[in-house]
Amino acid sequence: MANQSLKETPKTQSNPQTQVQGQNQQPKQKTVKLIIKRQDNSESKPYEESFEIPYKENLNVIACLMEIRRNPVNSKGEKTTPVTWDMNCLEEVCGACSMVINGRARQSCSAIVDQLEQPIRLEPMSTFPVIRDLQVDRSRMFD
């Protein structure tokens, strides 16, 4: 079911072997679409921004966020500020990368794209104040 929801987009390079009667039939590349609830700071109004990244097998949500950080361009092709979030161990132990993924709180390091409905919606944990984007202030846990 999850594989059927992966979006396919044409590759950017033309292949002469795929042209049929003057039409450019480009092979399709699978992509992962993410809709991220963003917020510039704790006082600003939240907004949503969409991103599409190339699909890779066994990709987790945190790897998607790292790809967006490497290339911060939204699905409209506009350059944007990199998304911020917390992470630490990347081994499903610490919980620092926890966020709301498709309406459910879970760790982004263990959330595998193939097992998620697309588009994947990411939001900050609602029980903590937002610092920026998916990054929240957990300091009250340690008081």
Which residues does each PLM region occupy?
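Signature of N-terminal electron-transfer/Fe-S-associated modules in redox systems
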Residues: 2-143
